[in-house]
Regions:
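HAD-like aspartate-dependent phosphatase fold
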Residues: 3-129
């Protein structure tokens, strides 16, 4: 496994700033919990995906924003957040768009606005790290 960054310009064949039309100077990365950050089956907590966690920490250190986007709610979400703190991972938003995105569009869409979405049912963690 390698830690890489996705070349969105190469994939879409255009300048990412023109494609997204977002005035952000950073990437927004949304990540799932179960099977992605944590190798577990809901509602249990399991082994951390340390390579992905290190990748996300490096992205935050570079100024990018991280959103936890999970189906967990209530106590299961609280347990997952505590687990993430134990791993040294914190989020800019949890199951929500960033405030600056809500302000930009004038509403809070149910669809998450992000540049990269990492989910075991969408993009395998191995594809980015």
């Amino acid at each position: 496994m390698y830690i890489i960054d996705i070349d969105i310009e190469h994939i879409f064949g255009t300048n990412i700033r023109d494609f997204r039309r977002l005035p952000m100077d950073y990437k927004i990365i949304a990540v799932d919990f179960d099977g992605t950050l944590c190798f577990s089956n809901w509602p249990e907590l399991g082994v951390p995906n340390t390579r992905l966690i290190q990748y996300l920490q490096a992205q935050q250190a570079a100024g990018n924003k991280i959103i936890l986007w999970t189906c967990r709610a209530g106590d299961a979400l609280s347990s997952a957040l505590d687990w993430c703190v134990e791993q040294g991972l914190c989020f800019d938003a949890i199951n929500d768009n960033l405030p600056e995105i809500v302000e930009l569009y004038g509403n809070n869409s149910r669809k998450i606005t992000c540049d990269i979405y990492i989910d075991d049912r969408n993009m395998l963690p191995e594809a980015v790290c």
